[in-house]
Amino acid sequence: MEQYKFILSGGGTGGHIYPAIAIANELKSRFPNCKILFVGAKDKMEMQKVPQAGYDIKGLSIAGLQRKITLQNAMFPFKLLSSLVKSFGIVQQFKPDVVIGTGGFASGAVLKVASILGIATVIQEQNSYPGITNKLLSKKANKICVAYENLEQFFPKDKMILTGNPVRQDLISVDGKRNEAIDYFKLDANKKTILILGGSLGARRINQLIAKEIDWLLSQNVQIIWQCGKLYFEDYKPFSGKENVQILSFIDRMDLVYAAADIVISRSGASSVSELAIVGKPVIFIPSPNVAEDHQTKNAQAIVNKQGAILLKESQLDSEFKFVFESLLNDKAKQEDLSKNIKQLALPNATKDIVDEIIKLVESQKS
């Protein structure tokens, strides 16, 4: 069997890293002797998470543009040029059959270099509103795997395939894990469990909200699992002294925490939205306003338009959060409707479908 080679690039947050790892795992399961190399951004979380998953990674000195004038922005052109030069070296030395980008600081440089060198590229666009980098790269990409319908205004229609976003395979069957989850997190089986998710790095405004309202929330006879993110863990750790509250910087067993959850309060990054659709939990999305193209609001709105979630903007939290949360908590029919509707939007075979497209691309080149 021919030994295929693949470069995967994506990072900065878990939402870009875990889809890339899921794709790598599926490629490895189909082609056990294939070679896989990751390219990420130095000092970002992929430099730890990818080796933990068993793959080699090279780091580029690249970071995104800030929204205000900073020294980092002044350095951006030099870092971009340096990353392009280093990407040339990496791609030419490794000689991949296909380069796959899942978003993040490094993937733009690697995909650009691959397309210049005539190497096949696949973009995995996770959001309902693509960023400028992927829009530019799409002109030369061979395939664009998307997670939302109606993206023809951004990408060439003949290159697009609706696949969904890769999610951890252990999330596909969480329904039967509730008892295990209750034991694992030492929960009270008679109380509703509220899961607070701020993404891998944490969400400052959601953390502030929960800290302010925690006594009121607990008065609703619920228990709380609060993933505050590694950036904020020390600030909010003291709340773990309260009864029925667990504070976690990061959650390793997402399958069990979803199985335990009755209601989820979450950011609406692409991976979070895809995971919540797979597990089918009633969710209140609080999008981050501090992301490119306001894509989190657009991701959440795409689900709300199908009656699959509730959307609260950060500007609405002080005036509306209590009413919205209490109304949902006390309305079993509403919870069931949201669960049913969001689950209908799930694309559980995304990883397999993306790898199918990658293999078609490889085989078309060899023929």
Curated annotation (Swiss-Prot):
Q: Which domain of life is it from?
A: Bacteria
**Which residues are involved in binding UDP-N-acetyl-alpha-D-glucosamine?**
13-15, 127, 168, 200, 251, 296
Q: Might you give the EC number(s) for this enzyme?
A: 2.4.1.227
Gene3D superfamilies according to UniProt? Glycogen Phosphorylase B
Among the entry's GO cellular component annotations, what is one?
A: plasma membrane
Isomerase among the record's keywords? no
Provide the protein's localization: Cell inner membrane
Q: Which CDD domains match?
A: GT28_MurG
Membrane topology annotation: Peripheral membrane protein
Q: Which UniProt keywords apply?
A: Cell cycle, Cell division, Cell inner membrane, Cell membrane, Cell shape, Cell wall biogenesis/degradation, Glycosyltransferase, Membrane, Peptidoglycan synthesis, Transferase
Database matches in InterPro entries: GlcNAc_MurG, Glyco_trans_28_C, GlycoTrans_28_N
Question: Where does the UniProt entry say this protein principally localizes?
Answer: membrane
Extract one GO molecular function annotation from the record: UDP-N-acetyl-D-glucosamine:N-acetylmuramoyl-L-alanyl-D-glutamyl-meso-2,6-diaminopimelyl-D-alanyl-D-alanine-diphosphoundecaprenol 4-beta-N-acetylglucosaminlytransferase activity
- Name the Gene Ontology biological process terms: carbohydrate metabolic process; cell division; cell wall organization; lipid glycosylation; peptidoglycan biosynthetic process; regulation of cell shape
The annotated pathway is: Cell wall biogenesis; peptidoglycan biosynthesis
Report which reactions are catalysed by this protein.
di-trans,octa-cis-undecaprenyl diphospho-N-acetyl-alpha-D-muramoyl-L-alanyl-D-glutamyl-meso-2,6-diaminopimeloyl-D-alanyl-D-alanine + UDP-N-acetyl-alpha-D-glucosamine = di-trans,octa-cis-undecaprenyl diphospho-[N-acetyl-alpha-D-glucosaminyl-(1->4)]-N-acetyl-alpha-D-muramoyl-L-alanyl-D-glutamyl-meso-2,6-diaminopimeloyl-D-alanyl-D-alanine + UDP + H(+)
Looking at the Swiss-Prot or TrEMBL record, what is one Pfam family this protein matches? Glyco_tran_28_C
Q: Kind of enzyme, top EC level?
A: transferase
Q: What is its biological role?
A: Cell wall formation. Catalyzes the transfer of a GlcNAc subunit on undecaprenyl-pyrophosphoryl-MurNAc-pentapeptide (lipid intermediate I) to form undecaprenyl-pyrophosphoryl-MurNAc-(pentapeptide)GlcNAc (lipid intermediate II).
Q: Which family is annotated?
A: Belongs to the glycosyltransferase 28 family. MurG subfamily.
> Under which name does UniProt file this protein?
UDP-N-acetylglucosamine--N-acetylmuramyl-(pentapeptide) pyrophosphoryl-undecaprenol N-acetylglucosamine transferase
